[in-house]
């Protein structure tokens, strides 16, 4: 969600101090499993926790720090309880790319290393689009990492982890086929912000309002020239459809959505966080199905 990126440094310093006291009371030994014999995995959000549950299966104890879809990962403030969970974790996962930087800081405070999916697995760089869960290459990279890491921690269950990983990625391939049913036009797509850009790219669409989405991402006002140009192109139906993130809006975006509907331009509604009680696979399937459907309009 495109809110101001306020970093809670003072809060983090206080939390780190409390965590260090906690760590001093805990064992510093790195175990291959938690006390219940399972591999402990802690992820920043439900996206990465849900995927991990599918790979680790009955041999994993997986938790997400952020469990509610209404919570904005950008501004989340972890607690000492969150820190305590990290001290027990064998694998710690974060999105990276500045999206959930608090997770990396929290892990460092308890002398643990976080795997940053964006940087470490997808080899993206600071400034790249952080909404990588809409990039279908992400689950492929992440699942392969989990299979390898879990197999190292529990070699006797390596075949089980590999089978789970292959089964999961086969379902991702089915979603990828949905993406290929898209784009039957050369018209560009307008977006309210870059949250869905990876999916659009997967389906072969091009974003036509880069200046607008860049301004939104940077928390600045788009220029009047940009607004006027977009307004004219929507009225003239020069775009395929308009992508609207329903979790983050503004008066300008609302005006564009209203204008698009008035002029018969389809509007594709998306969201940034996974809905509660929904799996990542179901969420992506729904999004890519909606994308395939709107291309037929």
Kindly label every feature range from the protein language model.
Residues 2-15, 22-297:
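Extracytoplasmic metal-acquisition and chelation regions
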């Amino acid at each position: 969600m495109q809110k101001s990126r306020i970093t809670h440094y003072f809060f983090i310093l206080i939390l780190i101090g409390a965590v260090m006291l906690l760590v001093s009371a805990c064992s510093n030994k790195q175990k291959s499993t938690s006390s219940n014999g399972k591999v402990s995995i802690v992820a920043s959000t439900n996206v990465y926790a849900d995927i991990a549950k599918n790979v680790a299966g009955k041999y994993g104890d997986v938790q997400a720090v952020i469990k509610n879809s209404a919570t904005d990962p950008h501004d989340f403030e972890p607690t000492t309880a969150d820190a305590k969970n990290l001290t027990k974790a064998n694998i710690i996962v974060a999105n990276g790319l500045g999206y959930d930087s608090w997770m990396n800081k929290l892990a460092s405070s308890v002398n643990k290393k976080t795997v940053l999916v964006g940087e470490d697995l997808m080899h993206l760089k600071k400034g790249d689009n952080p909404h990588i869960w809409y990039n279908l290459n992400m689950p492929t990279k992440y699942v392969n990492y989990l299979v390898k890491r879990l197999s190292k921690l529990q070699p006797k269950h390596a075949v089980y982890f590999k089978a789970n990983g292959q089964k999961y990625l086969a379902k991702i391939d089915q979603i990828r086929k949905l993406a290929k049913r898209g784009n039957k036009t050369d018209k560009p797509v307008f977006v309210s912000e870059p949250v869905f850009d990876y999916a659009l790219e997967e389906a072969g669409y091009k974003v036509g309002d880069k200046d607008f989405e860049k301004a939104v991402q940077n928390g600045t006002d788009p220029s009047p020239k940009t607004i006027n140009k977009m307004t004219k192109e929507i009225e003239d139906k020069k775009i395929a459809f308009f992508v609207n993130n329903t979790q983050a809006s503004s008066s300008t975006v609302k005006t564009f959505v209203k204008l698009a509907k008035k002029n018969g331009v389809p509007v594709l509604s998306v969201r940034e966080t996974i809905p509660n009680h929904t799996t990542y696979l179901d969420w992506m399937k729904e999004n890519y199905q909606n994308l395939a459907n709107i291309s037929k309009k």
